[in-house]
Amino acid sequence: MLGLTAQWMGMTGIHANSVAPILVSSEQGRQKSTFCKALMPPALSRYYMDNLKLSAQGKPERLLAEMGLLNMDEFDKYGTQQMPLLKNLMQMANLNICKAYQKNFRNLPRIASFIGTSNRFDLLTDPTGSRRFICIEAEHLIDCEGVMHDQIYAQLKAELLLSLIHISEPTRH
């Protein structure tokens, strides 16, 4: 959540939020996808997408500039051939995009962060490692009611701003 908020606030510098939590449970009905959607405040719900297509037709680069949270729902549907593209997308901080009916490319900041869900535990099969994904087991039904978005995002923003103050303070000996 901290990385997501930093991404939205444009506080990522040369590196984007390149880590995605993946909610996993072998049992269906734990509300993993519902929880992912509930992370977005109602006013920003149109910036949530749970149908990421890793193809030219899906325009994933454009989605990074236009959406706030991309849910890789049923993460195991992405094959090993798509992982290099996904890893590349996850580390992009700026995007060169040519919007519809335009001839010139524009450099746009990346806004979107990633999250995912799966009903399988054997989904990370990359022999070179999977440092971009953190699997979190949903052991019980996730309570998605009464998410206090104002409080959550105010706290995340305060933590980010506080970290900036600590970074910019001169070292005292």
Task: Give the location of each predicted region.
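P-loop NTPase catalytic core of nucleic-acid-dependent motor ATPases
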Residues: 1-65
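AAA+/SF3 P-loop NTPase mechanochemical coupling elements
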Residues: 59-65, 99-117
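Conserved AAA+/SF3 P-loop NTPase catalytic/coupling segment centered on the Walker-B
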Residues: 68-90, 124-129
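Conserved catalytic/switch belt of AAA+ P-loop NTPases
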Residues: 83-106
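Short, polar loop motifs at secondary-structure junctions
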Residues: 119-123
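A short helix-turn-beta junction within AAA+ P-loop NTPase domains corresponding to the substrate/partner-engaging
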Residues: 125-142
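C-terminal, non-catalytic macromolecule-binding modules
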Residues: 138-164
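Residue-level detector of conserved catalytic or cofactor/ligand-binding positions
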Residues: 165-173
